Swiss-Prot record:
The keyword Acyltransferase applies. Transfers an acetyl group from acetyl-CoA to L-homoserine, forming acetyl-L-homoserine. Substrate binds at R236, D360. The active site is at S165, D329, H359. HAMAP family: MetX_acyltransf (MF_00296). Residues 1-24 are annotated as: Disordered. Gene3D superfamilies: alpha/beta hydrolase (3.40.50.1820). It comes from Thermobifida fusca (strain YX). This is Homoserine O-acetyltransferase. The keyword Aminoacyl-tRNA synthetase does not apply.
Length: 379
């Protein structure tokens, strides 16, 4: 008789106070953070990780910004405090694209995230989890919080800021909000403003989480029950379909059944098992509250808001800029990267990452992305 020894899913996969710090360090904002929608957020702190060393004149710092479900653990093994290995292995290290013999690399966990930075799962000043009380934030708010990293290290400007997807949104906001602080800019698979289709894809994901009976309006952290892992699992399945390419799905899975299962008898296709796997995997390292907060921030991303529109906002960017998209990305199609390259003064022509992996190509095509990073840093 077989017994399932798989541990149950946690109500949240967030890093919580008392967990091992791993390779994280923290920077605390000295004042409450003013928010774009009004009001302010007190007690903000950001978790971050670093690789390499600052040079004498502090001119070699590179900022790496993660996507929606990423965190500060860009490279490195899974272990205490880090529920998953690095999400961009092969990019940072001696002799690699971000050569730690030359550059000091900094990667924060985004404001609103769940791996050490202030977010819905973290402790508010009153000692309780923020939960539903966590305010609506924007991509611009996250960047204003990250400015504290410059002060923390005594850096005047970043040698480069780079990011993909939500990380690219943040990188663009860095260059538009603080143009004198960003010398080089790499934007991967990201837009100047979120499109109607991107917002539409996000809508059922948010509904899935909020419809989970264990969501409790966002206040589930210290309540009995499994937490909204079912709703977040549905959201992850929907999102993952948009992250990958149709050709990859056909070539990798086709119409094959999952091993030992028969779809004609109620079993799963292999591609369904793949989506189930990613839903469970995310639940062990991420948080539904952060999923909602950060998805809302991505929905409202618009670099032109309050700046006279996108075209005028892009003209604010003074960094040496490279823009790249993925050939098979239907979530953030190449036309959006073309808009960035056309609008940013001095930007190179759009670079195309050839991949069947869809939007996730900026994460999976390490060799191609490494070439782009090296080229940008050589300029």
């Amino acid at each position: 008789m077989s017994h399932d020894t798989t541990p149950p899913l946690p109500a949240t996969g967030a890093w919580r106070e008392g967990d091992p710090p791993g390779d994280r360090r923290w920077v605390e904002l000295s004042e409450p953070l003013p928010l774009e929608t009004g009001g302010e957020l007190p007690g903000v702190r950001l978790a971050y990780e670093t690789w390499g060393s600052l040079n004498e004149d502090r001119s070699n710092a590179v900022l790496v910004l993660h996507a929606l479900t990423g965190d500060s653990h860009v490279v490195g093994p899974e272990g205490p405090g880090h529920p998953s290995p690095g999400w961009w292995e092969g990019i940072i290290g001696p002799g690699l694209a971000l050569d730690t013999d030359r550059y000091f690399v900094v990667a924060p966990n985004v404001l609103g995230g769940c791996q050490g930075s202030t977010g819905p799962s973290s402790t508010a000043p009153d000692g309780r989890p923020w939960g539903s009380r966590f305010p609506r934030i924007t991509i611009r708010d996250t960047v204003r919080a990250e400015f504290a990293l410059l002060r923390e290290f005594g850096i005047h400007s970043w040698a480069a800021v780079l990011g993909g997807s939500m990380g690219g949104m943040r990188a663009l906001e860095w260059a538009a909000t603080y143009p004198e602080r960003v010398r080089r800019l790499l934007l991967l698979a990201s837009p100047a403003a979120s499109s109607a289709q991107q917002i539409a894809w996000a809508a059922p994901q948010l509904h899935a989480i909020r419809s989970d009976p264990y969501w409790h309006g966002g206040d589930y952290y210290d309540r009995p029950g499994p937490g909204p892992v079912t709703g977040m699992g549905i959201a992850r399945r929907i999102a993952h379909i948009t992250y990958r390419g149709a050709t990859e799905f056909d070539e990798r899975f086709g119409r094959n059944p999952q091993d030992g299962e028969d779809p004609m008898a109620g079993g799963r296709f292999a591609v369904e098992s793949y989506l189930d796997h990613h839903a469970v995997k995310l639940a062990r390292r991420f948080d539904a509250g952060s999923y909602v907060v950060l998805t809302q921030a991505m929905n409202t991303h618009d670099v032109g808001r309050g700046r006279g529109g996108v075209a005028q906002a892009l003209r604010r960017v003074t960094a040496r800029t490279m823009v790249a998209g993925v050939s098979s990305d239907f979530l953030y199609p190449l036309a959006q990267q073309q808009e960035l390259a056309d609008g940013i003064p001095g930007a190179d022509e759009v670079r195309v990452i050839e991949s069947a992996s869809g939007h996730d190509g900026f994460l999976t095509e390490i060799n191609q992305v490494s070439v782009l990073i090296k080229e940008l840093l050589a300029q």
